[in-house]
Amino acid sequence: MSAALLLATLLMTGLGQVAQKLTVEHWRLVAADGWAARLRSPWPWLALLALGLGLACWLLLLQRVEVGSAYPMLALNFVLVTLVARFVFDEPVDRRHLAGLLLIVAGVALLGRQA
């Protein structure tokens, strides 16, 4: 159950981050049309929904797992969002980024053994 809640937390907060990026990309296109056009976009609403669900999953997870064990696992969002940035938004990811992601994964694996 805890692993499922952690995965749901990661996916929902990751989706929320991606939806925020899509929000600002859309807002750039409709900037001249004002706030009404911005608020008609589905992206900010998806961001709010996903982040709200991520918060709910996180709170449920914290009922079952110590925060000192659970919180480092959220660092996997850096990995998830960086991969989405690279493959969905075609943002550059260089060797330095990849090295950082590997260090994050190694750190999470190291801390996960203690949990």
From Swiss-Prot:
PANTHER family to which the protein is assigned, alphabetical: 4-AMINO-4-DEOXY-L-ARABINOSE-PHOSPHOUNDECAPRENOL FLIPPASE SUBUNIT ARNE-RELATED, SMR FAMILY PROTON-DEPENDENT DRUG EFFLUX TRANSPORTER SUGE
Protein name: Probable 4-amino-4-deoxy-L-arabinose-phosphoundecaprenol flippase subunit ArnE
Encoding gene (name): arnE
Native species: Pseudomonas paraeruginosa (strain DSM 24068 / PA7) (Pseudomonas aeruginosa (strain PA7))
Major subcellular location class: membrane
Localization per Swiss-Prot or TrEMBL: Cell inner membrane
GO cellular component: plasma membrane
InterPro entries the record matches: EamA_dom, Flippase_ArnE, Small_drug/metabolite_transptr
Recorded family membership: Belongs to the ArnE family.
Record's subunit section: Heterodimer of ArnE and ArnF.
